[in-house]
């Protein structure tokens, strides 16, 4: 803008102002035209860029289509190739299996001597490992250590080694361990005896079984039929206490449990019969006899141990048993012995028990003899019956004799599986 001279008049000042306005308007029009030209150039450049982008996108899409077509062709070929190879491999394996396993020649199979050792190769025998290490320490070859012991000394050493291993792994000191009370065992035995009493008294089972036994027994000619008059199975239970584990006195390498047993109860069996006098002629005289025998007290030391029925000492005892002079007292169990002989040959685990000679057994014998003039509680008869019962007990259960009861198999089986009965729904009861 031009500087205004203060000496100029108003008309000149107006002209100057108008000239300035014209100059400003001209400059504005020039700026607008320039701005419009720039906008047109920008639009043209943007359109060119968009066209180039479209061309690039079209080229990329075309390339992707080409690549996808090539990959699909290769994938289909790989899938077909894998399918064919898999089918061929399966057919090849089936042919090999049928040829070498289904139609294999029996002569080319494994010999029997190697087949018998398959189980030994599968089952881990820790005893063999311990004996092998022990034999190597003693200078014995490894091949001979796997053989079964052929002498009693070797078997005794093996039993001692097993017993020492058991005591070591269970942390039980035979010499210093305190005796146990066996309270839990008393509860289990009491429950078992209670169930047995219930079954015995149910429908008079014990009466019928004893009556059948007496009827089938062979009686002497001077005895008439025996009738049962009283049966009392008691209501108390034995108490086991003071249990301690000891080594066997016979030096057999076994462990045995010594348990004190005490029973204070009344177990009664009453019967009546007739004595027949058959001289000089049959049934010359008849003498009625009524008798009641009760066991009121028993206490003693029970020795229990687990044994193997295949041991030589038990096999020798079974062979020598028929030559024993007391076999006549077991006439009622001959059939059971014959039936169990086949089971004894198979062997297995058995429970061996016996009582110490210092046992205590008290009887109460009541007798009544005669028809009109009766003799009551004859001491001679009481002592005779008591001695006979003691002899019967000593010959079977008092040391050095013992009883061997074969234990059933504890292996779980389907036929032994049970489950609790489900209670009926309330809708069914209604």
UniProtKB/Swiss-Prot annotation:
Q: Show the ranges annotated as biased composition (Basic and acidic residues).
A: 126-138, 335-346
Lipid bilayer topology: Single-pass type I membrane protein
Note the InterPro entries from the entry.
Mmm1 (IPR027537), MMM1_dom (IPR019411), SMP_LBD (IPR031468)
Q: What subcellular compartments does it reside in?
A: Endoplasmic reticulum membrane
Molecular function per GO: lipid binding
Cytoplasmic topological domain: 104-430
Q: Which residues lie on this side of the membrane: Lumenal?
A: 1-82
Cite a single GO BP annotation: mitochondrion-endoplasmic reticulum membrane tethering
What keywords would UniProt list here? Endoplasmic reticulum, Lipid transport, Lipid-binding, Membrane, Transmembrane, Transmembrane helix, Transport
Q: Which residues form the SMP-LTD domain?
A: 178-408
Q: Which GO terms describe its cellular component?
A: endoplasmic reticulum membrane; ERMES complex
Which parts of the sequence are annotated with region: Disordered?
126-154, 315-346
Ranges that cross the membrane: 83-103
The similarity annotation says:
Belongs to the MMM1 family.
Q: What is known of its domains?
A: The SMP-LTD domain is a barrel-like domain that can bind various types of glycerophospholipids in its interior and mediate their transfer between two adjacent bilayers.
Q: What does this protein do?
A: Component of the ERMES/MDM complex, which serves as a molecular tether to connect the endoplasmic reticulum (ER) and mitochondria. Components of this complex are involved in the control of mitochondrial shape and protein biogenesis, and function in nonvesicular lipid trafficking between the ER and mitochondria. The MDM12-MMM1 subcomplex functions in the major beta-barrel assembly pathway that is responsible for biogenesis of all outer membrane beta-barrel proteins, and acts in a late step after the SAM complex.
The annotated subunit structure for this chain is:
Homodimer. Component of the ER-mitochondria encounter structure (ERMES) or MDM complex, composed of MMM1, MDM10, MDM12 and MDM34. A MMM1 homodimer associates with one molecule of MDM12 on each side in a pairwise head-to-tail manner, and the SMP-LTD domains of MMM1 and MDM12 generate a continuous hydrophobic tunnel for phospholipid trafficking.
PANTHER family xrefs: SMP-LTD DOMAIN-CONTAINING PROTEIN (PTHR13466:SF0), TEX2 PROTEIN-RELATED (PTHR13466)
* Protein name per Swiss-Prot or TrEMBL: Maintenance of mitochondrial morphology protein 1
Organism, scientific name: Lodderomyces elongisporus (strain ATCC 11503 / CBS 2605 / JCM 1781 / NBRC 1676 / NRRL YB-4239) (Yeast)
């Amino acid at each position: 803008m031009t500087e205004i001279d203060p000496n100029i008049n108003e008309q000149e000042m107006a002209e100057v102002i108008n000239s300035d306005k014209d100059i400003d308007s001209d400059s504005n029009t020039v700026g607008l035209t320039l701005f419009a030209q720039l906008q047109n150039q920008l639009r043209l450049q943007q359109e060119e860029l968009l066209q180039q982008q479209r061309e690039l996108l079209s080229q990329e899409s075309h390339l992707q289509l080409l690549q996808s077509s090539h990959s699909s062709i290769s994938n289909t070929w790989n899938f077909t190739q894998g399918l064919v190879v898999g089918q061929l491999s399966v057919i090849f394996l089936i042919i090999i299996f049928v040829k070498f396993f289904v139609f294999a020649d029996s002569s080319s199979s494994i010999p029997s001597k190697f087949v018998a050792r398959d189980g030994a190769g599968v089952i881990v025998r820790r005893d063999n490992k311990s004996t092998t290490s022990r034999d190597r320490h003693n200078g014995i070859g490894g091949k001979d250590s796997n053989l079964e012991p052929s002498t009693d000394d070797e078997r005794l050493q093996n039993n001692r080694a097993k017993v020492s291993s058991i005591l070591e792994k269970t942390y039980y000191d035979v010499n210093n361990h305190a005796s146990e009370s066996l309270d839990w065992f008393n509860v289990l035995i009491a429950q078992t005896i209670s169930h047995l009493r219930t079954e015995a008294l149910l429908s008079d089972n014990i009466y019928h079984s004893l009556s059948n036994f007496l009827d089938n027994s062979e009686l002497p000619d001077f005895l008439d039929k025996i009738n049962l008059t009283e049966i009392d199975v008691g209501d108390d239970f034995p108490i086991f206490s003071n249990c301690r584990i000891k080594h066997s006195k016979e030096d057999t390498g076994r462990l045995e449990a010594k348990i004190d047993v005490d029973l204070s109860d009344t177990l009664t069996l009453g019967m009546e019969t007739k004595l027949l006098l058959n001289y000089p002629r049959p049934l010359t005289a008849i003498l009625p006899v009524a008798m009641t025998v009760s066991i009121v007290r028993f206490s003693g030391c029970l020795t229990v141990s687990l044994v193997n029925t295949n041991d030589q000492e038990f096999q020798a005892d079974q062979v020598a048993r028929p030559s024993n002079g007391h076999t006549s007292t077991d006439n009622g169990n001959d059939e059971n012995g014959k039936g169990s002989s086949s089971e004894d040959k198979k062997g297995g685990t058995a429970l061996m028990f016996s009582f110490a000679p210092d046992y205590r057994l008290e009887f109460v014998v009541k007798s009544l003899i005669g028809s009109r003039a009766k003799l009551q509680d004859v001491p001679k008869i009481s002592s005779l019956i008591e001695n006979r019962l003691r002899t019967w007990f000593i010959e079977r259960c008092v040391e050095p004799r013992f009883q061997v009861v074969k234990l059933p198999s504890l292996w779980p089986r389907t036929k032994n599986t049970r489950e609790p009965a489900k209670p009926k729904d309330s809708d069914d009861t209604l």
